[in-house]
Regions:
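Phosphate-binding loop/pocket of nucleotide- and phosphate-handling active sites
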Residues: 37-38, 84-117
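A short, small-residue-rich loop immediately preceding and capping a beta-strand
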Residues: 73-81, 100-102
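Active-site/ligand-binding loops adjacent to catalytic centers
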Residues: 3-77, 114-117
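Buried hydrophobic packing segments
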Residues: 2, 64, 82-90
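Detector for Asparagine
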Residues: 50, 62, 82, 103-106
């Protein structure tokens, strides 16, 4: 991994703006599967985080559609959150730095859902 390679990455946790339990302590209804469960996960070690960001689910879903159309990358809502945050961070830190994010799953199971329909 990155740490074993001598890289000291900043780790940013993400959550849907509609359920910002980590950033505000308040949960809410949202449509991003597999994230923002409305409670702080017991395995989350906040001491290892450099920040937490709440991303609007609609921005994430729009990003999913854009990634599929422009890049041929299928992902679910959490992937959309990741890419939205990565773009925000890249703009903030400027040129000459690297931002790494993940595509959490493929979008096939979301084809008939609110994301791609």
């Amino acid at each position: 991994g990155m740490v074993e390679s001598g890289v000291d990455p900043d780790l940013i946790a993400l959550e849907p703006l509609q359920s910002p339990i980590l950033t505000t302590g308040k949960s809410g209804a949202h449509k991003v599967e597999g994230i923002g469960a409305g409670f702080e996960p017991p395995f989350l070690d906040k001491s290892k985080l450099n920040g937490v960001r709440a991303i609007d689910q609609e921005d994430a879903f729009n990003m999913c559609r854009l990634l599929a159309k422009e890049e041929g990358v299928f992902g679910g809502g959490s992937t959309g959150l990741n890419v939205c945050a990565a773009i925000e961070i890249a703009k903030e830190i400027g040129p000459g730095k690297r931002v790494v994010t993940l595509n959490c799953d493929n979008g096939l199971k979301y084809l008939g859902s609110h994301i791609y329909s």
